[in-house]
Amino acid sequence: VAGLAAGVNSLARLGRAGRGGHRLGPGDPGAFGETVSVVVPARDEAGRVGACVAALLAQDAAVAEVVVVDDGSADGTATEAARTGARVEAAPAPRPGVAGKAAACAHGARVATAGRWLAFVDADVVLAPEALSRLLAACLAAGAAAGSPLARQATRTWWEELLLPDLGLAVAERLDLDAVADPGRPAAFLSGQCLLVRRDAYDGVGGFEAVAGSLVEDVALAGRLKAAGHRLEVRLAPGLAAVRMYGRFGDLWEGLAKNLAEVWGAGTAPLAWQAARTAAGWAPWLALAARPGPPARRVALAGGLLQLTVRAGGRLVAGADPRLAVAYPLADLVLLAVYADSVRRRRTGAPLTWKGRTYADAGGRRGG
């Protein structure tokens, strides 16, 4: 019964997130004469930043400049970015208690002044040629000061393919895009993978400098924009943006441990909710393994099949292989474990290492 109820709940939330109104619509390459300055914060992204910059230079929106902010890379990131055609700026060393990525974004915003809009795009993101124009059109149509497309996770390893689509479904279950878009409701979210913001709104809330101590600077900036009365637009765009954040399982674990407690919460209630979600996913299969009588067996089978349908549907929405939905119980267990580790680090102040930097105060002001 628990598995059946969880499946119905997940199906309803997936349908809400995936319906047409939350997908990025067509854009206008002219975008009403708007111009965009693009900032790419990059730390040790050689082998990725070139593709990112090439895609940005091919945008059909009015991209006025592409500035790559090299955040102390040691692998040739700056050389690759410059060779591809970007202007390269060196980020100042972050002050104690200041997140490296937030500091790099803030520096980029200071030096990229040609556009009326700012776009912050991670170096591991590749955008389709129409991505920025469609996002800009959505923001203009809604009267929004900022927006983000929710990108497809480009995966190569089995662990990435197993975990990241299920993580996306877990995020979709928590993320109410209607509430984010409603200026009368406090819910706020933007994705730093690709974040478009009007320059005057960005400056008006203090930009990334004002949230430089936050572990999740994109969500913190979204909160400041929403509190200042600005509208936000977040749309599904799996065909317009692709990101590959993690190359190894260890990187995946560290990256999620860095963020999950900040995004989902470090309290007992959200952790218990995730544990209950995991238990509900396992419940129908454990019940079937116990060989119950026919009525209970039918309920358990229905719950299990519904869970599989939801997970396969979530993978299709995310542009991932639906066949790996059969391994969702394992994915749920791993995600619960990494979330518990993230909460532990947040509560105890355990150090976190990310991109070669160690943030000792895990319970306070960290980031990267």
Map each language-model feature to its residues.
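Membrane-embedded multi-pass helical conduit in multi-pass membrane proteins
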Residues: L271-A350
